[in-house]
């Protein structure tokens, strides 16, 4: 495979509602947050892991393909009327590590084209927080409602990055000889699906609505609102 180009996809990722991506911290603090967001261990600033973006976008595209399984799609799922879309998903996100590298279809698909990066706060958002003496996160109080008595119980605090926060979004797309433009189209559909769905935890409760602003693919501006992921 001959590498012909590496395209940068950039945008400002804006939170339309609060975002919670957990840190996995099992340490308990009396009076503290029950569910903390992931933070940079050095700066203690929250960020969006590239792995979270990659996993959610891939999952949405797999659902769109109609071939979704309990595990990520693999070589064995390339069949039927959606075979080419499954191939393109594997081209973008990669095949599993246990795939037979000598199998012809694995060689045809090649290496993963996408490279996701962690998203940090934009400089202007950091400046806004500093100038207004605002916290980078908020505590969202939630309860479980007793269906019989209608009383609230089991109170808990979930840490969120508040609506309005802005992040620098960037990924790279490796373009190899004979790669189809359909790969870029599929990626854009994945980004649009993410806008229509949610990122992180508690999406069914309104968390994690995001929007990609000032999106560019290489030197070309793209309006995701014009992308129909179901076409």
Question: Language-model segments: what does each one mean?
Answer:
Residues 1-140, 154-231:
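RNA-binding basic/glycine-rich loop and surface signature characteristic of RAMP-family CRISPR effectors
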